[in-house]
């Protein structure tokens, strides 16, 4: 009988590193240009073909709601792109937050790939942005966030819409780190059934239930050819799929990634870990994100709300999960924490 590793032997997978975009969340958006260059050039030398570089919330992300980075997206992108020898710089664009004008600026600064991201039921907000990215000649992916909140048939319909707008790759995005391998397989498989053979499928995982690697392998089994991850797992919540660990698993299974495993390990240990303000791991609160199906970016916001209102962050996160709050509703974290504090007699009503 053919084993799992035998069935994937020789399969080619493209890595896309997120530590300079998703990792901004874990660093409270405080990564400097020189740090960006150091990380990106090391990833480039390790053979990583795509490196995402923006504010954590993507183009247009600098704001009161999402936090302010020390530099503009244009400064980050331009500085990194100028140093790349083989890797392409990518960006995140959420329609309604980022604009086509900002995408043009990112392209002018050297970005050549984009994740156009919508909630998993709102692909119809992305046609203009996807079409514009294709017009610029960018490698263009549709990115269905919080994919656990739509069933496989729904994900297939949304992915088909993104493909019709011009997306060359469609992502199943486990923003909450909630999914298990069978959930990933069902959604990726549903996409593979309806998308054209030439349209790629990607998977973006978070490690909140410790399933980032298993889910990424499940995605490949079901037909995905692009996998997002982050060296040392630097990302929101318990981090993204740790790329160097995933690379080692792929090598064991005979999956062709094209990256230098030992160099990736060195980037993680020598550059990323010393940058961390806190160890990005599965802790009480990040585990709650995965358990309750909450957007991973809410982690630090909820911890700050807990300090302010005296309600445990875990309780806040469970309530946000019950309400099915999604990315972009960060303002509701404070509102929820305040309401819970009032209900518990911790805060006097005005």
Curated annotation (Swiss-Prot):
Which NCBIfam families did the record assign?
4OH_2_O_val_ald, PRK08195.1
Q: Where does substrate bind?
A: 21-22, 175, 204, 295
* Gene name of the record: lapG
Q: Which UniProt keywords apply?
A: Aromatic hydrocarbons catabolism, Lyase, Manganese, Metal-binding
Top-level division of the source organism's lineage: Bacteria
Family membership:
Belongs to the 4-hydroxy-2-oxovalerate aldolase family.
Record-marked site positions (Transition state stabilizer): 21
Q: Which organism is it from?
A: Azotobacter vinelandii (strain DJ / ATCC BAA-1303)
Kindly state which reaction or reactions the protein catalyses. (S)-4-hydroxy-2-oxopentanoate = acetaldehyde + pyruvate
- Give the positions the UniProt entry annotates as the active site: 25 (proton acceptor)
* Residues in Pyruvate carboxyltransferase domain copies: 13-265
Q: Which GO terms describe its biological process?
A: catabolic process; L-leucine biosynthetic process
Q: Which EC class, in a word?
A: lyase
Instruction: Spell out the HAMAP family in the cross-references.
Output: HOA
Looking up SUPFAM superfamilies in the UniProt record yields: Aldolase, post-HMGL domain-like
Which GO terms label this protein's molecular function in UniProt? 2-isopropylmalate synthase activity; 4-hydroxy-2-oxovalerate aldolase activity; manganese ion binding
Entry's PROSITE patterns? Answer: PYR_CT (PS50991)
Q: Which PANTHER family match?
A: 2-ISOPROPYLMALATE SYNTHASE 1, CHLOROPLASTIC-RELATED (PTHR10277:SF9), HOMOCITRATE SYNTHASE-RELATED (PTHR10277)
Checking CDD domains in the record gives: DRE_TIM_HOA (cd07943)
Protein's UniProt name: 4-hydroxy-2-oxovalerate aldolase 3
Instruction: Quote the InterPro entries the UniProt record gives.
Output: 2-IPM_HCS-like, 4OH_2_O-val_aldolase, Aldolase_TIM, DmpG_comm, DRE_TIM_HOA, PYR_CT
Binding-site positions, Mn(2+): 22, 204, 206
Reported EC number(s) for this entry are: 4.1.3.39
């Amino acid at each position: 009988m053919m084993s799992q590793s035998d069935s994937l032997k020789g399969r080619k997978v493209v890595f896309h590193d997120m530590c300079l975009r998703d990792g901004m969340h874990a660093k409270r958006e405080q990564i400097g240009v020189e740090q960006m260059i150091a990380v990106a050039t090391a990833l480039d030398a390790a053979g990583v073909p795509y490196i995402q570089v923006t504010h954590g919330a993507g183009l247009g992300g600098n704001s009161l709601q999402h936090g302010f980075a020390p530099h503009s997206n244009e400064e980050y992108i331009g500085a990194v792109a100028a140093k790349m020898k083989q890797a392409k710089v990518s960006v995140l664009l959420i329609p309604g937050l980022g604009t086509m004008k900002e995408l043009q600026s990112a392209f002018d600064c050297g970005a050549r790939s984009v994740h156009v991201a919508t909630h998993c039921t709102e692909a119809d907000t992305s046609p203009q942005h996807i079409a514009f990215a294709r017009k610029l000649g960018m490698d263009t992916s549709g990115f269905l966030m919080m994919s656990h909140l739509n069933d496989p048939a729904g994900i297939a319909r949304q992915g088909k819409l993104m493909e019709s707008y011009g997306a060359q790759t469609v992502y199943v995005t486990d923003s909450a780190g909630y999914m298990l391998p069978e959930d990933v397989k069902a959604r990726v498989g549903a996409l593979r059934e309806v998308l054209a053979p030439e349209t790629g499928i990607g998977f973006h995982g978070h490690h909140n239930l410790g399933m980032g690697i298993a889910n990424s392998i499940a995605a490949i089994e079901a037909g995905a050819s692009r996998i997002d991850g982050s060296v040392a797992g630097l990302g929101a919540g318990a981090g993204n799929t740790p790329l160097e660990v995933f690379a080692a698993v792929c090598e064991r299974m005979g999956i062709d990634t094209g990256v230098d495993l030992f160099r990736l390990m060195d980037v993680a240990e020598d550059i990323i870990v010393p940058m961390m303000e806190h160890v990005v791991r599965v802790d009480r609160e990040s585990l709650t994100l995965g358990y309750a199906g909450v957007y991973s970016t809410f982690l630090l916001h909820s911890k700050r709300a807990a300090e302010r209102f005296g309600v445990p962050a875990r309780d806040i996160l469970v309530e946000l999960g019950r309400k099915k709050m999604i990315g972009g509703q960060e303002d509701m974290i404070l509102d929820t924490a305040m309401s819970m504090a009032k209900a518990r007699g911790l805060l006097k009503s005005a």
